[in-house]
Amino acid sequence: MSVSAQSVPTTIACLLGPTASGKTAAALALAARRPIEIVSVDSALVYRDMDIGTAKPTREERARVPHHLIDIIDPADAYSAASFRADTLRLIGEIVARGNTPLLAGGTMLYYKALTQGLNDLPTADPAVRAELDAEAARDGWPALHARLAQIDPATAARLAPNDAQRIQRALEVFMLSGQPMSALLAAPRPADEAAAAYRFVPVALEPSDRAVLHARIAQRFDAMLAAGFIDEVERLRRRDDLHLGLPSMRCVGYRQAWEFLDGDIDYRTMRDKGIFATRQLCKRQITWLRAMPERIVVDCIAPDSTARALDALERVLDGRIAAG
């Protein structure tokens, strides 16, 4: 159904922030005030059997408020931004129809961008093409494939590191399937999308006024994961014949480093240091995405009363007392 000039889009509050910024605490605080259902905006939480390393909400927390898009696929499978977009638009409609309030919460900014801005017409993943590229990478190395990408799509290659296997593979896959550089397809106008036009997405962004404080939280969280049995969790996954480091699930922060430790490639201390560093790099990318959203409502996530501030911002959004600019 088209959104007429008279219809008012439904406001959807979105709680976005980097790792360890307090999203779960703020979401649960809102759940104590309103009948909400949380839709996860997190590419790691979709995987089953990956609980500790993804800092998945506990069973108790998930019992207190309905959560969606958590534990929905096996680690051997893939989940795309397009799938997230379709699932989220469907879920929002179902939650509203139940008389509840949807709250989007997470830190996968690519998913949020796909939801709010739409998707370009890129070809879907092809397992055969990916297997071919994986075999070439095993033989020649990802820097060699990066060099090939630079010849056919210099714009995309210029923004990717030579060892960024996931993105190099995707860019080459797109070219092999479409015959066009991914940069050209991404620059093409997005098709009109009436489904998302029914909603106004308002982001409340949890950002640190002092990044060093957030970095300390990240280190504490990683150590807590290790103490909670993270290495054992990865070992159980590693024993499966159908899982390997080339899969998106095993590229999640921390899992690759723990896997390398279990393989004997690095020692325990190096694994810990690399895991924390990778998490900090993810945090940096997440903050960069957030700061590119001029319409966001910023809450300092390291303030002593950050949960109360985030709760206040979310309630003002939902009450119509504040809106995206």
UniProtKB/Swiss-Prot annotation:
InterPro entries: Dimethylallyltransferase, IPT, P-loop_NTPase. It is an enzyme of class 2 (transferase). Substrate binds at T19, A20, S21, G22, K23, T24. Its EC number is 2.5.1.75. One of its GO terms (molecular function) is tRNA dimethylallyltransferase activity. One of its GO terms (biological process) is tRNA modification. SUPFAM superfamilies: P-loop containing nucleoside triphosphate hydrolases. Keywords: ATP-binding, Magnesium, Nucleotide-binding, Transferase, tRNA processing. Belongs to the IPP transferase family. PANTHER family: TRNA DIMETHYLALLYLTRANSFERASE. This is tRNA dimethylallyltransferase. It comes from Burkholderia multivorans (strain ATCC 17616 / 249). The gene is miaA.
